[in-house]
Amino acid sequence: MSKERIGHAAASRLWAGASGYSYKEWKGTFYPEDIKPEAMLKWYAERLPTVEINNTFYQMPKTSVLENWAKSTPEGFRFAIKASRRITHMARLKAETAADSVAYLYKNLATLGHKRGPVLFQLPPFLKKDLPRLSEFLRLLPENHYAAFEFRNESWFADDVYDALKAAGATLCFSEREDNTPPPLVPTAPWGYVRLRLETYSDRDLQQWAERLAAAGWGEIYVYFMHEPTAPAYAQTLMQFGVSSAKVQGKIPP
């Protein structure tokens, strides 16, 4: 199959990629054996339309790094960014403690321009539902925040939490993992954020996911696979299955 963009007249747009891209373990499968680290992002972005950056959880890159990311990727590429642990694990969404970190995060991400995609706030498993805290935190977010929330404690899976997210225009992240019960696939915003974290997906699994995502009614859908060597192929296959039900923004390699 050629690298041309493929699309469909349906309203949804599916963006599929991996959690990270700079893995030497991908050499010989996704990357050429002799690829240099500085060439990986360009290679990746020629084949997939989005990437989830996780190391921002530990440290926010300098603006010069963000500028280089933007320059190394084609028009239409999107970076999903995991929010700093200072916000989610240290401040634990307490607005008065997290305010400066939230402002710093979004100020820096503006460097990416239109290539900035969603911002993922991944909460620790020990943090239980606290609706007043969540509501106050949501008021901190800037306009056009594009925020997704991954709750890893089941107490958060409740209608009043979904209502708070809807009111703020934030999305409930669906995360499929081996070690927990995933949340329901509840649309709380016009766009969806899905993390598929199982080690193995069959073609049938991916086809079922494409159908399920199309049925959710989102205008845009971001999907990220775990950072295994199989992740790029899973993302490409999901986009191929999505052609029949969603407009695919991306490039499919031969």
Predicted regions and their residues:
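Residues lining hydrophobic/aromatic ligand-binding pockets adjacent to catalytic sites
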Residues: 1-254
